[in-house]
């Protein structure tokens, strides 16, 4: 309860600092409400013939212990370069296609994604589907598995038997920001109509960040840690406006290795903003000894 109260005060303070022009730009509706479904919606559609629920997790153990009935497991190493963070960049399109088809994803599938233990896992898979041109069929489960369990909805340990899918993909490289391009726009993001946002906790941002980036910790898009529901579209848009977003800008997010930034990317797309994620993120940037800023 105390965390809810603190979060509420922070939100009021944040909204109070938004100018009238920013508030007007914020709007009140998501441009893509279909990208997010509630636990109630999912509970009512569990029997839909074309429904594919994906349990995105880092290991088989958490899936085997409990998952939403009918969910198929897709480990993070099936859609990133490494089995666990920090080795996380996009796999080649043909491998991504094969891994999705193996769990029964087809062109007509309605894909619902939830994370087993960390919401950015689900957002990262959404980003991957967007890269493949399939995000129009996909949505995140608001609140994820935590909310499903909190509401005492049914769980299962059964592994569904599914036929391989047939999925058409088309890579969209424009959603993946590359280091050379980020370096170019970081000199003056506003002139490039870019909002460059660091999705890491503030202490990580202050410890070193890309020049021109603003701090936008991804968890602030949720109500509270123990209530991992997405804030309202109006609140989310106000947050982006406060960070410097203006209509027509491209939101470019990064973090340490591309997990947390995926959630910022998802929120931007949910609101209808042009968005990209710097997949290499701070790990690539710092390893390449690119310019860095410390502090605020």
Regions found by a protein language model. Give the residues of each.
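Helix-loop module immediately N-terminal to the HCX5R catalytic loop
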Residues: 81-109, 220-251
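Mature N-terminal segment immediately following signal peptide/propeptide cleavage
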Residues: 30-59, 70-73
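Active-site neighborhoods of enzymes that stabilize oxyanions during catalysis
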Residues: 29-38, 44, 80, 145-210, ...
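Bacterial N-terminal signal peptides that target proteins for export
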Residues: 1-7
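Bacterial N-terminal signal peptides
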Residues: 7-17
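Thiolate-centered catalytic microenvironments shared by cysteine-dependent enzyme domains
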Residues: 25, 90-181, 256, 260-276, ...
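C-terminal soluble interaction/assembly domains
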Residues: 238, 243-296
